[in-house]
Amino acid sequence: KIYREKYAFAVKCAKKYIPHKRILGEGGLHIFVELDENIDARLLLDKCIKRNVIFMPGDIFYTNGKGKNSFRLGFARSSLKEIEKGFNIIGEIIKEMEEEN
């Protein structure tokens, strides 16, 4: 039940803070977020690490070179406050990256 609530909260935060194409996952301990093609998730990760937010870039889950604009974020060990803060930071950095392009 706790993880179900965290999952629902994480999806809500992702939709609120992150400009996304789609959010994948049907529950569990992580969500997969697909961004616009112009956002490189590895570059996004480099910037997020500096603000203490980490995730797995999506391309590691593909063998065909796809997924460069996606990421998987786990939240099992994070509080609701940390989940919201993390998604807010990711969203801020994506907006900065879009302004740079």
Model-identified regions with their sequence ranges:
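Preference for bulky hydrophobic residues occupying beta-strand positions
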Residues: 14, 33, 73-75
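Alpha-helical structural signal in soluble globular domains
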Residues: 9, 13-17, 47, 93
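Conserved glycine-rich beta-strand-loop-beta hairpin in the small C-terminal domain of fold type I
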Residues: 2-11, 21-34
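Conserved C-terminal alpha-helix-loop-beta "cap" of PLP-dependent enzymes
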Residues: 33-71, 85
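Surface-exposed helix-capping loop/turn segments at secondary-structure junctions
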Residues: 15-23, 98-101
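PLP-dependent enzyme catalytic core of the Aspartate aminotransferase-like
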Residues: 50-51, 65-101
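Short, contiguous acidic/charged loop-to-helix segments that flank catalytic cores in large enzymes
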Residues: 1, 21, 33-36, 62-63, ...
